Amino acid sequence: MFRKIVSKRGYIFTYEAIVIAFIFLSVFYIGYMVYSHNMLTALEEKKDTEKFHKALLLKDYFLRNNKFPGKFYNKTYLDNFTNELDIKEKTFDLFNNFSEYKGLIRFIIYPNIYDEELDNISDEICANDGLQAITYNFSSNTFKIYSNVNTTFNNANLSISGMDLIYFKENVYIPKITGMKYGDSINLYGCNGDHIYFKVNSEIISASARVVTNNGNPFITWQNWRYATPILIINNLNQNLNDYDVKIVFDSQSYINSGEMRTDCGDVRFVDEDGNPLSYWIEPNTIDTPHTVAWVKVNLAPNEHKLIYMLYGNPTATTTANGDNTFPLFFDDFSKGNLDNTKWTYNFNNPLFVNDTYPNGINFTYLSLDYTYYNNHNYIIYDINNTHISSISTYYPNTSVRFHANFHKKYEEWGGFYININGNDYNREVITNYHWGGEWLRAESSVLNQDYDSYIILQDPDLYDNWHTYEIQRDGGSSVNFIIDDAIYKTIYSNIYTGDLPISFYARKYDYSTKYGYYPVPQDEQNGNISIDWVFVRKYVEPEPTVTLLSSDVIFTVNGYIYKKPLKSVFDNIDITPNLNVGINEIRILSSPLPVEFLIKTNENTDFYYLTLSPNNVTIVVKP
């Protein structure tokens, strides 16, 4: 039965009719809202598309109007050189007037590592007639070009503001070096990725290429060394790093096999850019291997890019490596066959030293901490349940210890940052196989007591009865890195001791009082026995400086002819004379970690015109 509603005017409605009307109105309203939303969205999208299209057109117009050559070059330079060039590269020239774009466009040029290396030899570049360095500032970045144009611009940093800004990133070639010179020779410069064009109207009698640094001849006192490998060190922190030891890894085996290096690396030297010798030490067990490890002590300014050199190739040289000078915090290689009382404390008499030979044929002496040996001979003076050595000095929590050791037994051996006998036994960052943890070595960090202990099991049987290099890096209270042979990396982030700790090595008597399911233990595995070849302590920060050997090939083309030379030496020039012509020539540097200098000589005085185009990332900000 339908229920009815009677209005004052006498109209009769049913509830069902009202519900249907309400549903109809709701559907209509929702449909209208959806339609309106879609219409507004479409309008906004159309507006955004038009805005982006306008910005794109403005950006393209900006680049097209400001390509090379700009408006301020010498007319002779333009008429006699650039008008003859058939430049295919997409260029952007800073020698233009950008005032018409003020408030509409701003651009930023980001310098790269190759620009910085080229800036290091700015004095040599500016030695060409009338050439000057012009610096452009983009926020915290600076970008330099070298030119004989004498106009300085203040409108390169165009101002722009607002919310609706659109950013475009463009890869373009910028005229990095431009100029003219009259004479019988010219020095041209470029770095990785650069294209060099030059014009000469006289006969070229000689032309050569060489990599360059900011010092014309830093090796005047090293003339008996045939090779010099550049090494770039970058301080990644905004702080000074003084007397900081950096690790340099190189393949001495390949150098030795090719007759370029002594078999014992005795001719290896490290020098700074001025040719001054640097303190260094080479891990002797890595000599004549593909993974030769050298440590060099350097001073680094905040965020500094430092270039040093590894010299080699002198068959009559003998080593000057010195661990004590390289690692002022601590170093010992036990080569004298005694324990230095100024470095170590120990609890036994008659330390056992053993002479041995590495696989590379180099002799060495190591200290043996064999508990059974010292106990059977009654050599232990005190603390008779172990034999140990501990450094007299303690080291703050931003240091690293590195040692070459052999863990012979499966139980009761310790090595690393470990508190002395008068301190808390649980304050430590060590490599250990203390028997409660089972038969495997462990990377362990603990503090205060047994309830605050973190460890990582190193389940590798090769770690026993074989020599390995271990490193423990303490990054304050943040973390501890455990590294084996520069290949296995483990990190612990909890239960880290933040106080000073000595360096200690322990070989303990097996503890029968606690079993933990690992008992019985074979008799020949019960007492600790660890051998130590060498050990040192150095400063440690994170991130560490980046070290790059710039020993790659230098590859460039001269008028299409490819030159490929190994960058083993900065001494040797490369003859490129046969492939140069009278007129316009093109050189493309395809790969080079250092700037390259090209010396061109003619048979008479003549006009030289030259251009170096450098690939760069340019961000163009547009306000449509």
From Swiss-Prot:
Keywords: Membrane, Transmembrane, Transmembrane helix. It is found in: Membrane. The chain crosses the membrane at residues 10-30. It holds the Pfam family DUF2341. The keyword Membrane applies. It is a single-pass membrane protein. The keyword Metal-binding does not apply. GO terms for cellular component: membrane. This is Uncharacterized protein MJ1470.
